[in-house]
From Swiss-Prot:
This is Thiazole synthase. The gene is thiG. SUPFAM superfamilies: ThiG-like. Catalyzes the rearrangement of 1-deoxy-D-xylulose 5-phosphate (DXP) to produce the thiazole phosphate moiety of thiamine. Sulfur is provided by the thiocarboxylate moiety of the carrier protein ThiS. In vitro, sulfur can be provided by H(2)S. 1-deoxy-D-xylulose 5-phosphate binds at residues 156, 182-183, 204-205. It comes from Shewanella sp. (strain MR-4).
């Protein structure tokens, strides 16, 4: 069972709500994934009414909402978006995203750390999206973040675990859950992340942009489950030389 800020999650697959062709398809995919934590971009919500056709079905489905600050270019904008989410959605949870460059969508480490410190002081449950930087992740943990969300590769690229060496370091040192976010493009990527010891993965593009999002959601669910079970079972040690599984010459001496 995964626990974040005192809340237990049976599913270690978190999902997003963007890029789906319809709200109905989004909901069917989320249901198939069995995800219990779903991200929602504040920029998609009508600021005048707080309405969006995805909020009602998500609430009816009983999933926990994780509003994100996507679109924020600095700490000030991210803090404003988080406060808005708390007021409009009634949640302390926030996925902190600050990426000032719209071309590459790389997270701004300096602004993210500053925003995280302020938000944690204000009582938010902060889950920051960041580079796979072990030093930064430790700093975020120290200021009170409930989890860290290092990227596997650039958002939406489906490149997989390009940052694997650094993700391993983050997992090894972390005292809070590590959720691999961004760039996971195939169920095999998700399974591998879980085999490394990640606590969860967040997937959006790979499911939403699939020819069959519902089937892909099922695949990711199974991949995450299998990857976690493999990690808990204990993977065999990687060797540089061949190691025989049984004596090679014993029968010759009989």
């Amino acid at each position: 069972m995964l626990t974040i800020a005192g809340v237990e999650f049976e599913s270690r697959l978190f999902t997003g709500t963007g890029k789906f062709s319809s709200s109905q398809l989004m909901m069917e995919s989320i249901k198939a994934s069995q995800s219990q934590l779903v991200t929602v971009a504040m920029k998609r919500i009508d600021l005048k009414t707080g309405a969006d056709d995805l909020l009602s079905p998500l609430r009816q489905a009983g999933v926990r909402l994780l509003p994100n600050t996507s679109g924020a270019r600095n700490a000030k904008e991210a803090i404003f978006a988080a406060e808005l989410a708390r007021e409009m959605l009634g949640t302390q949870w926030v996925k902190l995203e600050i990426h000032p460059d719209p071309k590459y969508l790389m997270p701004d480490a300096v602004e993210t750390l500053a925003a995280a410190k302020t938000l944690c002081e204000r009582g938010f449950i902060v889950m920051p999206y960041v580079h796979a930087d072990p030093v930064l992740c430790r700093r975020l943990e120290e200021v009170g973040c409930a989890a860290v969300m290092p990227l596997a590769s650039p958002i939406g690229t489906n490149q997989g675990l390009v940052t694997e060496p650094f993700i391993k370091m983050i997992i090894e040192q972390a005292k809070v859950p590590v959720v691999i976010d961004a760039g996971i493009g195939a169920p095999s990527h998700a399974a591998h992340a879980m085999e490394l010891g990640a606590d969860a993965v967040l997937v959006n593009t790979a499911i939403a942009s699939s020819a069959s999002p519902i089937d892909m959601a099922l695949c990711f669910k199974d991949a995450v489950d299998c990857g976690r079970r493999a990690f808990e079972a204990g993977l065999g040690r990687v060797q540089t030389q061949a190691v025989h599984t049984s004596p090679l010459t014993g029968f010759l001496q009989q």
